[in-house]
């Protein structure tokens, strides 16, 4: 694909810091172990280079490694593309259809979302991937998806090498008996014997690499199918969630309207071409998008504003009655709170007695919300939001009516 024609560019050397994270360290470690062991097993014990098949096999292994690493680093260092700081639409009246990001001090372009990890508004944000320590979005979606495709394919090849190496070295002969047909693989062994014997250490290492290869094939293969489903529908993971909430909002308030997702062009091929191009550069500029008939540039952002307003209506005000340090699994808040801590990268927030929180969602023993600050609406002041134990707060009696919208508001929505 055209992704291979693109050039990895470093805006600055700070991008190299993305490698100093557990995600890339594990990912690159798995790639290194599987590719290195596949080459060693092939050359020493299974398919020697002096045979035609062995040479072709070795070249294919190198090719898999190069393509996997290229798309991996492309996805990591090219990045998703960020909305320019201070961005606003050309027509000033259009700002009424957009949300404002206080951190970036810019309006959120259609399909963009603010990432807490990257601390920027990301174009066509799908998710923040810990394995590349970057977001998956507009500019790197193709490279990321190709990596998800190539990694399982390379691991399947490597797994075949591992299995055949262990089989031929342990049994010295491989035969399939179908009536009178026999396939003799004994020629795959070195004659004379290899310089390095296939001992216990080699067997254990090959078996470990086989486990990594099979696990990667299953896990990354599933992620590839999820991403292809997203691409063919031209709908990111976040946008799928927005669409579901739109349907819930319409059903909850019994509205006489239908939400139509604006970016699905009605053709899987047209949706596919927006991400994968021969030039390696995705269609558009990441700020404006082609939409289906009957929709416009702000169809989705208007729905987001409606959901945000609905979120404020449904939010509940709480007062902090116990201090909370912000620990991930606080044992001093009870055993149930400790073991039911949310499995998410979303932050926990410190609480001090007397503070007020506006909770928007929650679990049985945990709540998620924003601290109510006097200067929370001043431009440039970041919101303080995250998870906290439910037992640390109590509902404010005067705000009990905010648990659900008044009937009058439901009719007006």
Curated annotation (Swiss-Prot):
Active-site residues, Swiss-Prot/TrEMBL: 129
Enzyme class name: transferase
Transmembrane segments: 25-45, 58-78, 144-164, 206-226
GO MF annotations, alphabetized: palmitoyltransferase activity; protein-cysteine S-palmitoyltransferase activity; protein-cysteine S-stearoyltransferase activity
EC number(s) from the headed UniProt entry: 2.3.1.225, 2.3.1.-
DHHC domain segment(s): 99-149
Phenotype for residue 410 to A: Impaired localization to the endoplasmic reticulum
Pfam families, alphabetized: DHHC, SH3_2
Compartment(s) of residence: Endoplasmic reticulum membrane
Topological domain spans for side Cytoplasmic: 1-24, 79-143, 227-413
PANTHER family per UniProt: PALMITOYLTRANSFERASE ZDHHC16 (PTHR12246)
Name listed for the protein in its UniProt record: Palmitoyltransferase ZDHHC6
Species name: Homo sapiens
């Amino acid at each position: 694909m055209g992704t291979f024609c693109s050039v990895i560019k470093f805006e600055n050397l700070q991008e190299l810091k993305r490698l100093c994270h557990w995600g890339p360290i594990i990912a690159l470690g798995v790639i290194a172990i599987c590719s290195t062991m596949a080459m060693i097993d092939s050359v020493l014990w299974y398919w020697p280079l002096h045979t035609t098949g062995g040479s072709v096999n070795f070249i294919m292994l190198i090719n898999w490694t190069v393509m996997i690493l290229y798309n991996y680093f492309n996805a990591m260092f090219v990045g998703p593309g960020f909305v320019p700081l201070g961005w606003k639409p050309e027509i000033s009246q259009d700002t009424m259809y957009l949300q404002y990001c206080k951190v970036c001090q810019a309006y959120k372009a259609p399909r963009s979302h603010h990432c807490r990890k990257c601390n920027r508004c990301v174009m066509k944000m799908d998710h923040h991937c810990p394995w590349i320590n970057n977001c998956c979005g507009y500019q790197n979606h193709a490279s990321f998806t190709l990596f998800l495709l190539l990694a399982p394919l390379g691991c399947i090849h490597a797994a075949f090498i591992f299995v055949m190496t262990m089989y031929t070295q342990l049994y010295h002969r491989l035969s399939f008996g179908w009536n009178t047909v026999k396939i003799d693989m004994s020629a795959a062994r070195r004659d004379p014997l290899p310089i390095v014997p296939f001992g216990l250490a080699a067997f254990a290492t090959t078996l470990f690499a086989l486990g990594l290869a099979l696990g990667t094939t299953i896990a990354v293969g599933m992620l590839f199918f999820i991403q292809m489903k997203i691409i063919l529908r031209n709908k990111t993971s976040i946008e799928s969630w927005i669409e579901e909430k739109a349907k819930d909002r319409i059903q909850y308030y019994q509205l006489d309207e239908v939400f139509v997702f604006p970016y699905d062009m009605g053709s899987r091929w047209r949706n596919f071409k927006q991400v994968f191009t021969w030039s390696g550069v995705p269609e558009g500029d990441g700020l404006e998008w082609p939409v289906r008939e009957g929709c416009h540039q702000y169809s989705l952002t208007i729905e987001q504003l409606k959901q945000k307003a609905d979120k404020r209506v449904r939010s509940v005000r709480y007062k902090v009655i116990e201090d909370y340090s912000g620990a991930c699994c606080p044992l001093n808040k009870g055993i149930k709170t400790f073991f039911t801590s949310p499995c998410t990268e979303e932050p926990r927030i410190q609480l001090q007695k007397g503070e007020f929180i506006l909770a928007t969602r929650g679990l049985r023993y945990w709540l998620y919300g924003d601290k109510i600050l006097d200067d929370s609406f001043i431009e440039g002041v970041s919101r303080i939001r995250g998870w906290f134990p439910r037992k640390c707060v109590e509902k404010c009696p005067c705000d009990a009516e905010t648990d659900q919208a008044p009937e009058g508001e439901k009719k007006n929505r």
